[in-house]
Curated annotation (Swiss-Prot):
The active site is at E172 (proton donor), E361 (nucleophile). This is Phospho-cellobiase. It comes from the Bacteria. PROSITE patterns: GLYCOSYL_HYDROL_F1_1 (PS00572), GLYCOSYL_HYDROL_F1_2 (PS00653). The lineage of its organism: Bacteria, Pseudomonadati, Pseudomonadota, Gammaproteobacteria, Enterobacterales. GO terms for biological process: carbohydrate catabolic process. Disulfide bonds: none annotated. InterPro entries: Glyco_hydro_1, Glyco_hydro_1_AS, Glyco_hydro_1_N_CS, Glycoside_hydrolase_SF.
Length: 464
């Protein structure tokens, strides 16, 4: 029976703005996510406090976390990825002193996890930042935000140093190229130069956070977090092969800086060719040398790349502008399903960086049907996850050093891209619909029992 390494971390992943709710409770400020209630990737619509948005309550994890963590423990989780809402700690982002009520909430959350022997994996910034930093400073386009983020990072490292040993800096940092407001707090019509300058500030902030973590939590580890956007050439034409190399570099560049400590030559050429002159100081270059300890990433799909401009035009409707792969099936939301691609990506990242890897998001968004007896027979989710985990196990056999696996949305949550409840990922069903109706009651899906067995057998129960 093939199993995973003994110290392997099994669990699930969430984000504060998609589960917590309590969006203005206990002194929390508005975030970029709060002002975009019906689609984080859409236009910014500044909300008035009190206006109704589905994320205001989300799944009410802020008040129900003991129940949810108990359910995670029942499944056998030894790891849970959560994020801290920056605006709970610094409501406007630029305060001199943190909000004690916000700090106290995460103390209680981490203590509850410890009671169940669940290791926290904590993201500092998961698709949100204090809205006041966007309004008053222009988001990550302003160099001052680096200092505000470093203060926030140092504050939480010092507060939770005894409780949290695994940290991540920015969720899917490469998504800023596709959704600037979500990633760096810039309008969607920002120029490439503006977006890359904001990304540069974020990369410096990530490195400064790594330095702070190494100083304050010497036995801790801090990683980056990439959207694993593996691309295949649509054909074996040399032009398609080279275009694929370039497209893969567009996301690998973030990992290159965070793992190697400097800008790669291909990006410096890209900046030259596109007339992008970044403000990079000597202090920035020195800061970037502080690299991450491990690489974490999300994996949902692969796509194809072609140098054919007509085919590319048709692909620009989806957020990553990928050409569909004719050899793969797709989910209800059009995401192509490619388990072997996960093994390929693990090998690509391991060969490139030789640093430990961590799969911190993977899962299937689907519409679940509640039967008359209350059961939810999500065999499609079981099949999807089983097939991906089999390939993960093969990658470990290939020699990849993998720390763990946290499925995305182990409990149903509000989706990031559309602010929907109907796009469900969880092993645990939450009774709430897209309009916010429902009791918020939790119930176990068929996949709950399946994942429990996978964890109990350390992957031995997976079907080849």
């Amino acid at each position: 029976m093939k199993t995973f390494p003994q110290a392997f971390l099994w669990g699930g992943a969430t984000a504060a703005n998609q589960v917590e709710g309590a969006y203005l409770e206990d002194g929390k400020g508005l975030t970029t996510s709060d002002v975009q209630p019906r689609g984080v990737f859409g236009d910014v619509v500044e909300r008035v406090p009190g206006d109704s948005g589905i994320k205001d309550i989300a799944i009410d994890f802020y008040h129900r976390y003991p129940e949810d963590i108990s359910l995670f423990a029942e499944m056998g989780f030894n790891c849970l990825r959560v994020s801290i809402a920056w605006a709970r700690i610094f409501p406007h982002g630029d305060e001199a002193q943190p909000n004690e009520a916000g700090l106290a909430f995460y103390d209680k959350l981490f203590d509850e996890m410890a009671k169940h022997n669940i290791t926290p994996l904590v993201t500092l910034s998961h698709y949100e930042m204090p809205w006041a930093l966007v309004k008053n400073y222009g988001g990550w386009g302003n160099r001052k935000v680096i200092g505000f983020f470093e203060r926030y990072a140092r504050t939480v490292f010092e507060r939770y140093q005894a409780k949290v040993k695994l940290w991540l800096t920015f969720n899917e940092i490469n998504m800023s190229l596709h959704a600037p407001m979500t990633g760096v707090g810039l309008p969607a019509d920002s120029s490439k130069a503006e977006v890359y300058q904001a990304i540069h500030h974020q990369l410096v902030a990530s490195a400064l956070a790594a330095k702070a973590c190494h100083d304050i939590v010497p036995e801790g580890k801090i990683g980056n977090m990439l959207l694993g956007g593996l691309m295949y050439p649509l054909s074996c034409k040399p032009d398609d092969i080279f275009e694929t190399l370039q497209q893969n570099r567009s996301w690998q560049f973030f990992g290159d800086v965070q793992c190697r400590g400097a800008y790669p030559g291909y990006m410096l050429r890209y900046f030259r060719d596109n007339g992008i002159n970044l403000d990079i100081t000597d202090a920035d270059r020195a800061a970037l040398k502080e690299t991450v300890d491990f690489i974490s990433f999300s994996y949902y799909m692969t796509g194809c790349v072609t140098a054919d401009e007509e085919l590319n035009k048709k692909a620009r409707g989806n957020i990553l502008s990928m050409v569909p792969n004719p050899h793969l099936a797709s989910s209800e939301w059009g995401w192509q399903i490619d388990p072997l691609g996960l093994r390929t990506l693990l090998n690509v990242l391991w060969d490139r960086y030789q640093k430990p890897l961590f799969i911190v998001e993977n899962g299937l968004g689907a519409k679940d049907k509640v039967e008359a007896d209350g059961s939810i027979n999500d065999d499609y989710r079981i099949s999807y996850l089983n097939d991906h985990l089999v390939q993960v196990r093969e990658a470990i056999e290939d020699g990849v050093e993998l720390m763990g696996y946290t499925s995305w949305g182990p409990i149903d949550l509000v989706s990031a891209s559309k602010a929907e409840m109907s796009k469900r990922y969880g092993f645990i069903y939450v009774d709430r619909d897209d309009d916010g109706n429902g009791t918020l009651a939790r119930s176990r899906k068929k996949s709950f029992w399946w994942y429990k067995e996978v964890i109990a057998t350390n992957g031995g129960s997976l079907k080849e």
